[in-house]
A protein has these predicted regions:
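Hydrophobic anchor residue at the start of the ABC signature
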Residues: 75
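Short coil-to-helix segment of the ABC ATPase nucleotide-binding domain corresponding to the Q-loop/switch region
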Residues: 21-28
Length: 172
């Protein structure tokens, strides 16, 4: 990735929702700006809102949602454009544990089923191991690659099952 691209979706650590817009308007903003707010894309967004338990909040303002709900809105906004590459900066940081597990399983499924590539930035090593094919460990500033771990023993194992897999603890 060397610049803006329609094939890349970015989800920053903070939700970046506009307080004066409804949730629907926030999650479809990228589609509107790109001229892609078609009935098919809107149907996809409705499915995502339903999947993440936010369908009843589509006309609410961001200030009326919890931090976890806002983070799920940011994820929906990122997925709405159906990018091929996902850049996810601490995407689960505002989520409670149960929601974190459910959303991470969803992202894993989306990546696998739709053949997407994702770059996940996290400080949680168990989260990285649960979600990834490969973990790149960076040094503190300036970031330099310290090591790369290929998680071959966990290939194809979904995030929730990875945590119980005998190889999981060996990656720490």
């Amino acid at each position: 990735v060397c610049g803006p691209s329609r094939k890349v979706g970015f989800m920053p650590q903070r939700d970046q929702l506009f307080e004066w817009r409804s949730i629907w308007s926030n999650v479809t903003l990228g589609l509107t700006v790109r001229g892609e707010n078609t009935p098919q894309r809107q149907a996809h967004v409705r499915e995502l809102l339903e999947r993440y338990g936010l369908a009843d909040f589509a006309q609410k303002r961001p200030s009326q949602l919890s931090g976890g709900m806002r983070q799920r809105c940011a994820l929906i906004r990122t997925l709405a454009a159906q990018p091929k590459v996902l850049l996810l900066d601490e995407p689960f940081s505002a989520l409670d544990y149960q929601t974190r597990l459910a959303v991470s399983a969803d992202i894993y499924r989306i990546i696998r089923q739709e053949g997407k590539t994702a770059l996940l930035v996290t400080h949680d090593i168990s989260e990285a191991i649960s979600m990834s094919d490969r973990v790149v460990v960076l040094s503190h500033r300036p970031a330099v690659v310290k090591s790369i771990h290929r998680l071959t023993q966990l290939q194809g194992v979904p995030p929730l099952q990875r945590r119980d897999h005998p190889a999981f603890a060996g990656y720490f």
